[in-house]
Structures are given as C-alpha cells and as structure tokens.
C-alpha cells in the first residue's frame, strides 16, 4: 500500500472515530438536559438587607464555656479589639457564615449539582443532588464544606419546593459572626431548608440548623434574601444592593445587636 493511501485510510478511520465519539458526547449531553419547569424560579441575584450579622434575637444556645468566650469577645471589641473574628485575619467566612453575605448571590441549578455563587470574596458552594452517599473515608475539610442535598416536592404538585442540604467537613478556624466563638476543622454539621416564600416569590428563605459541640442543642436560624436584578442575570424587581458600614460605627452596631440577642 502506498504512503498516500495509508494516510488516507488513517484519516478516514480517525474521522469515523471522531464522529462516533462526538455522537456519544452529544447523546450524553442530551441525557443530562434538566427540566427547569420542575424547579422553583430562583434565577437572578439574591442579597440581604441586614448588616453582616445574624438577625437580632436569634440567640445561640451556648454552653457555659463558650458563653464565657462570647462575653470576652464582646469586651475586647468594646475596647477596640477584634475579638474572636477570624475574618480580621483574612480567613474566609466559611459555612454557615458565608450565608450572611451582603453582596449578591446567584443560584445555578444543573443536573446533579446546585451551585451558589456568592460575590463576597468570590465564595462558592457545590451542593451535590445526584443521590450520592457520604464518603466512607474522611475528606479534606474546606471552608464551604462538603454538601449533599435533594430537591423535595412537599405539596405533591409535581414540582420541587424545597432544597434540603446537609454540609459536613467544614474547615476552621472560623466564627459564625464577628463575636461568637471560633470553630476548628470538622466541629460543625449544618442542615438547611432553602425555599421561596409562597406569598412573596421574590424572597428566598434559608432555614439553617447548626449542630456543634459549642451549643447545648441544635441551633436554627432563618435568613431571608430579596431578589435583585443583577446586571447580566435574569431576575425580579430592580433593587440596590446594600453595603454595610465598616469601622468603629459598624463595630458598635455589631456589639449592640449581639447584646440584644443575649
């Protein structure tokens, strides 16, 4: 066989292989198409109108040991210190504090994974919804943790209403806000129920339950996020994104809100 014919046969075989391969990829892509009609309309940007703290009155059930740490942190902040706040040392907020973000968040639903893209220091969360089990071996903790979730149709209408999430393997050091005690690696489990308000579909709720040795019982808080019409994102009514006031004024407000909570 001549050299030219050999090259021609090789090129033909390569072309057939590419067509078969691309056909498999396209078939796999078609099988991964998601029916967005079954999911809640959570497009657009979501933000918070409160300062970068848990809502006033949501008191954490601290053990006596950690209550003493909180009081010492409040006293230190009152005299100009940083208290227990790890973000003053440039650590990421971590879970669940990153859900207190004051910058917009976008939620993206894909087959098998739901993403939360948070503009504040470019945090992101990957919530696996592909039915996987928890890893049998320990995995390296990260500040966002390892999240497994499932979409639930609570009212039986054939459409999903709630995203239930559990997050483990959360890295430390981190605090839940600017004053609460510091948590280290793998000390917390976070459970969430994320859903749209039925009466106000431009409001997203996140029921966050924290299980941690610093608390006498699981602690549940509820955070609310209005929908923002963020540039480049489809969404609801146009709103301006609030920005907290940092510095001494912000610190005083923080201390005041925590004192009201305790």
Model-derived features: where do they sit?
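Hydrophobic small-molecule pocket/channel-lining residues, especially in calycin-type beta-barrels
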Residues: 2-9, 17, 21-262
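Active-site bordering "gate/hinge" segments
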Residues: 13
């Amino acid at each position: 066989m001549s050299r030219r014919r050999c090259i021609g046969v090789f090129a033909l075989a390569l072309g057939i292989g590419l067509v078969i391969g691309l056909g498999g990829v396209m078939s796999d892509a078609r099988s991964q198409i998601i029916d967005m009609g079954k999911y809640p309309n959570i497009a657009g940007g979501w933000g918070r109108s409160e300062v970068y703290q848990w809502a006033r009155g949501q008191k954490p059930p601290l053990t006596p040991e950690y209550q003493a740490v909180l009081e010492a942190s409040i006293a230190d902040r009152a005299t100009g210190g940083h208290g227990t706040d790890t973000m003053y040392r440039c650590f990421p907020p971590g879970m669940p504090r990153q859900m207190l973000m004051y910058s917009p968040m976008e939620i993206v639903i894909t087959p098998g994974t739901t993403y939360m893209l948070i503009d504040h220091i470019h945090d992101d969360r990957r919530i696996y919804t592909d039915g996987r089990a928890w890893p049998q071996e320990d995995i390296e903790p990260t500040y966002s943790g390892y999240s497994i979730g499932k979409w639930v149709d609570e009212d039986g209408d054939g459409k999903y209403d709630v995203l239930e999430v559990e997050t483990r393997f959360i890295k430390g050091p981190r605090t839940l806000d600017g004053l609460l005690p510091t948590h280290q690696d793998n000390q917390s489990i976070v459970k969430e129920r994320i859903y749209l308000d039925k009466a106000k579909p431009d409001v997203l709720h996140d029921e966050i339950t924290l299980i941690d040795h610093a608390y006498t019982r699981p602690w549940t808080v509820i955070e609310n996020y209005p929908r923002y019409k963020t540039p480049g994102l489809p969404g609801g009514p146009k709103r301006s994104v609030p920005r907290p006031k940092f510095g001494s004024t912000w610190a005083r407000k923080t201390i005041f809100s925590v004192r009201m909570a305790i």
